[in-house]
């Protein structure tokens, strides 16, 4: 067969789908129980979509197609996200001719040079990639209702008015507030950064360090050296301080409110603290070595402790000053032990090695299972030899910190006897009240880079607008909604619960970027994770809005709060519709239709997206729905999918390790791409794109097309007499229908593909082998029937070639709208399946015997099936599952007692092997029916149950496991 022209087939059916508006739902449907509304996070248009995105968008399309074929009225809409700073940042970098950005857009995204320079205007970026994304989605065969398409920001006024309404509603509820809060900040551009504004380090946590002001006397001046710690309770156990002798430190005046102090901190810390409500005036810079060997005073205990050298101290982490608590910190203990062995380092700084030798550890925490110094014991237990054993040290630190926090009891007055997790906060609070300590915010990992290409810092912002996700009552409603939602996979539920717990105020607006101006404070622009939480409701009315816009009958400025309140929050009212018609100029009957559509489609059945959106978008989606909509409109389910890699490597635009979705379609055909990414891993697992494997799959898809095309010419005559192998094929087809259906109902796409494609393909290969040489009506009936079912099973995954094959089969209309197959009760036949499995296994066993025994020129095989009494033993064991019970039951029969010793051994063996599943088949009948086939497969004469016991094998026969002798 000639190579299949996937592109021609795809274009043919995409054109027909668009012309016939196949994927626009029935607008007159009434029974709500047969509606299915599914959405996926709309794509952000800063570049081309890659094959990782392909997974995110193909999953809901496959589910939408499946439900449509099940008879549901399905809504699967799409829109485009352009809000925020990233697109503006890209335009800025292209304007500045940034080489990295130019490389990505010219070489990776293949943007023509004449268009690339237009990207200095953010609107040109949006225009180009919106068109490209739409084309990609159409080329992929996504069954989208394009009549509802829109994009975000004030560039699309109707949606912008919807967002204004959302924010007024939240503000009226007290859920949008103004105040001071820590945010990720781009210090160059001067704007807060949401998750989508981060190019690198999006998931990095913000840590809250307590910085404790140790006191240094220098030239008669009292100077503070603030040591940063996540464990303020351990200040009672400090034995020394650590500084990096090679790092640059500063002496600086630090002003906060009406307080002015002199601090010594790293140069990097001085810069970062200047963003956290402190005015920093650097007096001098110097290397850390200047302070090594000096003493500082612990402000809590009054102890004088020495400053020791430590190159492990990172000046870019917190203050660059570290307090050492070796009894409870494995790193500190090991660093001290290393220093004791490296006296030359101490002598370099005129430190007497005996000073370090004589450092006494201070025990603070009683921990069950450990002695006085848990850190020392954990280090010994894990076999840590030095600071070079980084992995083991990290493990030791994690183990001790976790154990002490959850199970430790504090030993030092006035907190003695209290749990560490309680003491930690008490001490932190007390130290701050006394002015001994302050708070500093720091990233848990670095770097954190904004999409403008700048290193982010943490800034305390005043007069910033926030959505208050920390509101306790709101959290409770979100928990209630989550408890009533279906989450796929269920294992992700705990992550949602955790996010609801820790979510706090979230900056919702910034002063740069594209978006909708905050309606009451328009110098602020609503950011991208805040204008994308309830747009699923807007989809329900957007086709009407779009039509009115196209006809020139819409004034977006008239879409006020009352308009959206009525559509989304009030009961039906003819009077209100007339009032709103007067105000908006929209006919009352259209307003009524909008209201009807919202009430019909809501609640949303499924929200789909990748797992990285759980800590932000997907949880914000729950919060905003429970705030704005009544309980009956709260979402029903969220499906979370995994990520994609390319040839085993994480995809990276900057490194060129990325495959654009559209390029994958061009290379392989949309249906091959769809089937590959759906069949490679379950939707919640990560997948790896391998070009070689995609090529293999393409050949299998072509074989599918070839087989069904051939079977399309057959006539499926009802009432033909079927042989057992025909019944087996129909039974297996039933299993494929059942397996694929269950897989798709549970979003287990890999399982569904295994059943719908691979299982049918493999079973068909076996059936064709078993029926080789036959060309009768029964076989033609089976193959024609199989073709009809198989094409429908494959339609959600490979819609284009399925449509082409459906047409060849003479199917009515589009296969996309055909009835999803259901198991035929008349086809079920477990016994025939067992018999066929029995034949398959026997063939493999005989091949193995010939190979292992190295039998050359084998002529015949003698097959001995299990006698009746062995079947009875197997059935008794399956029923009783106990030696005594089975033996007792069997020995009641005099005939069985004749085989007493053999039965005893057989029961023991079956119980040991846990052979508790047994279903009786007529082994001899199965063998005689398949005798010709077995002989042909093996090239041997097959003799079934002869009188002669060849090689004494007869006694080895067991139920479902015949004895074999080959000569």
Curated annotation (Swiss-Prot):
| Binding residues annotated for ATP, in chain numbering | 653
The record places the motif ('HIGH' region) at: 43-53
| Subcellular location per the Swiss-Prot or TrEMBL entry | Cytoplasm
Q: Name one GO cellular component term.
A: cytoplasm
Top EC class of this enzyme: ligase
GO biological-process terms attached to the record:
leucyl-tRNA aminoacylation
Q: Which reaction does it catalyse?
A: tRNA(Leu) + L-leucine + ATP = L-leucyl-tRNA(Leu) + AMP + diphosphate
Q: Is NAD a UniProt keyword of this protein?
A: no
Alphabetical UniProt keywords:
Aminoacyl-tRNA synthetase, ATP-binding, Cytoplasm, Ligase, Nucleotide-binding, Protein biosynthesis
> Annotated motif 'KMSKS' region: location in the chain?
650-654
| A single GO molecular function term of this UniProt record | leucine-tRNA ligase activity
The family database entries (NCBIfam families) matched by this protein are listed as: leuS_arch, PRK12300.1
Instruction: Read off the HAMAP family from this record.
Output: Leu_tRNA_synth_A
The protein's name in its UniProt record: Leucine--tRNA ligase
């Amino acid at each position: 067969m000639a190579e299949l022209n996937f592109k021609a087939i795809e274009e043919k059916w995409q054109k027909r789908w668009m012309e016939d508006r196949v994927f626009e739902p029935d607008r007159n449907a009434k029974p709500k129980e047969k509606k299915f509304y599914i959405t996926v996070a709309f794509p952000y248009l800063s570049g081309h979509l890659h094959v990782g995105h392909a997974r995110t968008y193909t999953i809901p399309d496959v589910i939408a197609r499946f439900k449509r074929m099940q008879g549901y009225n399905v809504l699967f809409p799409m829109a485009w996200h352009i809000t925020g700073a990233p697109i503006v940042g890209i335009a800025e970098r292209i304007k500045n001719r940034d080489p990295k950005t130019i490389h990505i857009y010219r070489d990776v995204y293949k943007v023509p040079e004449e268009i690339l320079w237009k990207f200095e205007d953010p609107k040109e970026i949006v225009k180009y990639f919106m068109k490209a994304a739409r084309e990609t989605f159409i080329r992929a065969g996504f069954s989208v209702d394009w009549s509802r398409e829109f994009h975000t920001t004030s560039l699309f006024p109707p949606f912008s008015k919807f967002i204004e309404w959302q924010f007024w509603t939240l503000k009226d509820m007290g859920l949008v507030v103004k105040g001071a809060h820590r945010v990720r900040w781009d210090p160059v551009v001067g704007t807060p950064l949401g998750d989508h504004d981060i190019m690198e380090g999006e998931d990095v946590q913000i840590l809250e360090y307590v910085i404790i002001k140790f006191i240094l006397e220098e030239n008669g001046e009292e100077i503070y050296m603030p040591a940063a710690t996540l464990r303020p309770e351990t200040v009672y156990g400090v034995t020394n301080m650590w500084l990096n002798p090679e790092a640059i430190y500063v002496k600086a005046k630090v002003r906060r409110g009406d307080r002015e102090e002199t601090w010594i901190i790293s140069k990097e810390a001085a810069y970062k603290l200047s963003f956290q409500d402190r005015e920093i005036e650097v007096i001098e810079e110097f290397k850390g070595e200047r302070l090594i060997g000096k003493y500082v005073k612990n402000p809590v205990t009054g102890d004088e402790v020495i400053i020791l050298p430590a190159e492990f101290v990172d000046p870019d982490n917190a203050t660059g000053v570290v307090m050492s608590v070796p009894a409870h910190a494995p790193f500190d203990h090991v660093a001290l032990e290393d220093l004791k062995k490296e006296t030359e380092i101490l002598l370099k700084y005129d430190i007497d090695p005996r000073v370090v030798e004589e450092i006494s550890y201070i025990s603070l925490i009683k921990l069950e299972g450990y002695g006085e110094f848990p850190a020392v014991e954990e280090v010994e237990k894990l076999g840590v030899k030095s600071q070079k054993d980084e992995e083991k040290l990290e493990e030791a630190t994690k183990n001790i910190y976790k154990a002490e926090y959850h199970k430790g009891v504090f030993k030092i007055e006035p907190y003695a006897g209290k749990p560490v997790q309680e003491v930690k906060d008490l001490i932190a609070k007390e130290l701050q009240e006394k002015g001994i300590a302050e708070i500093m915010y720091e990233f848990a990992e670095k770097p954190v880079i904004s999409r403008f290409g700048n290193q982010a810092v943490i800034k305390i912002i005043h007069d910033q607008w926030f959505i208050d996700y920390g509101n306790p009552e709101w959290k409770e409603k979100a928990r209630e909604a989550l408890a009533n939602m279906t989450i796929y996979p269920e294992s992700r539920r705990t992550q949602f619960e955790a996010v609801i717990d820790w979510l706090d105020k979230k900056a919702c607006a910034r002063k740069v970027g594209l978006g909708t101006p905050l309606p009451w404070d328009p110098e602020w622009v609503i950011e991208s994770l805040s204008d994308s939480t309830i747009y699923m409701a807007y989809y329900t009315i957007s086709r009407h809005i779009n039509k009115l816009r196209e006809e020139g009958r819409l004034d977006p400025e008239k879409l006020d709060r009352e308009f959206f309140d009525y559509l989304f929050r009030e009961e039906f009212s003819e009077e209100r519709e007339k009032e709103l018609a007067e105000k908006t100029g929209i006919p009352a009957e259209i307003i009524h239709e909008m209201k009807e559509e919202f009430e019909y489609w809501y609640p949303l059945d499924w929200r789909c997206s990748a797992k990285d959106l759980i800590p932000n978008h997907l949880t914000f989606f729950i919060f905003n729905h429970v705030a704005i909509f009544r309980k009956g409109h709260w979402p029903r389910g969220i499906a979370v999918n995994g990520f994609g890699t390319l040839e085993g490597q994480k995809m990276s635009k900057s490194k060129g390790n990325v495959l654009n979705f559209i390029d994958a379609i061009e290379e392989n055909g949309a249906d091959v791409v769809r089937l590959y990414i759906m069949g490679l891993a379950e939707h919640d697992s990560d997948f790896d794109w391998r070009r070689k494997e995609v090529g293999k799959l393409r050949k299998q898809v072509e074989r599918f097309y070839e087989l069904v095309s051939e079977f399309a010419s057959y006539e499926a005559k009802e009432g033909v007499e079927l042989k057992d192998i025909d019944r087996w094929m129909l039974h297996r087809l039933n299993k494929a229908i059942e397996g694929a259906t269950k897989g798709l109902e549970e979003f287990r796409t890999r399982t569904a593909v295994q059943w719908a494609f691979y299982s049918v393909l493999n079973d068909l290969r076996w059936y064709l082998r078993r029926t080789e040489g036959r060309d009768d009506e029964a076989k033609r009936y089976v193959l024609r029937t199989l073709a009809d079912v198989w094409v429908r099973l494959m339609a959600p995954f490979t819609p284009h070639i399925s449509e082409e094959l459906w047409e060849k089969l003479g199917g009515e209309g589009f296969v996309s709208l055909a009835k999803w197959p259901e198991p035929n009760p008349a086809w079920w036949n477990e016994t025939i399946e067992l018999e066929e499995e029995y034949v398959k296994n026997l063939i493999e066993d005989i091949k193995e015997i010939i190979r292992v025994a190295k039998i050359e020129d084998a002529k015949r095989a003698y097959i001995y099936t299990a006698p009746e009494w062995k079947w009875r033993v197997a059935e008794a064991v399956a029923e009783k599952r106990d030696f005594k019970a089975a033996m007792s039951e069997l020995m009641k029969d005099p005939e069985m007692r004749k085989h007493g010793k053999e039965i005893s051994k057989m029961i023991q063996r079956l119980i040991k092997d846990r052979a508790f599943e047994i279903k009786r088949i007529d082994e001899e009948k199965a063998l005689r029916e398949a005798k010709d086939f077995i002989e042909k497969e093996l090239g041997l004469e097959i003799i079934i149950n002869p009188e002669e016991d060849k090689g004494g094998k007869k006694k080895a026969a067991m139920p479902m496991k015949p004895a074999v002798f080959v000569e």
